[in-house]
Amino acid sequence: MEKSYNIFLLYKSILKPIEFVQSINRVNSFLLLLPIMIGSSVMAILNFYIHSDQIHTFTSLNFEKISCIIVGVIGAIAPLFTIMGYFCFYYVVSLFLVIESEKLKRSIFFISTISYTPILFASLLNVLLNIFFEYRPTGFTNLTFLSIDFPNMTAIFAEIDIFKIISAFLLGYLFTVTFSREKIEAVIYPVTWVVLNVLVALI
């Protein structure tokens, strides 16, 4: 029978993830994913209202409500794209490494979800900075403030985000420790992930 853990103790096990990750169940995965989706949705709605107040886009109350709902849904779904991207990348890596584990997919999904939290924190930070400073659609935690006349440069700078990089390296660490890999792999995989994202931004 799978052992269940209190959701508030999840991060306490980040330094000893092997036994913890291998003991997780579907309920714990959902309990961790749910607040991330809710938090992301709230951040998206707040950011939407901050931007809307500045440019006065609303023409009616109904339009405002519909727009808010759409933004909230998109905000809730957005983390899934990153988490599934993490999952697919590391699942392919695990296939190449021939990693054998009864809970391989579940473990990768779980550590992918944990690793998204720095990005969620960045969303909160950007909302706060947008409130107290001039609104910046692309956020304050990346390099988009640099003005360089080069195609797709804004998209590239958006990927060079300190919290996205922290997220990538956190996942690399959790992956290598959970599956007993070499320490150097905790650097190789995150760097590869960041480079791939930059290359995709160039397309």
Language-model features: locations:
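Membrane-interface helix-boundary motifs at transmembrane edges
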Residues: 20-30, 98-105, 176-185
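Hydrophobic alpha-helical transmembrane segments
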Residues: 33-34, 72, 76, 186-191
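N-terminal juxtamembrane cytosolic/stromal segments of multi-pass membrane proteins
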Residues: 1-66
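Hydrophobic alpha-helical transmembrane segments and adjacent short intramembrane/lumenal linkers
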Residues: 106-190, 197-203
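Membrane-interface segments at the starts/ends of alpha-helical transmembrane spans
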Residues: 61-74, 148-156
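Juxtamembrane/disordered regions of integral membrane proteins
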Residues: 32-52, 60, 97-98, 136-143, ...
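Alpha-helical transmembrane segments of polytopic integral membrane proteins
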Residues: 14, 86-90, 168, 172
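Alpha-helical transmembrane segments with an aromatic anchor "belt"
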Residues: 64-133
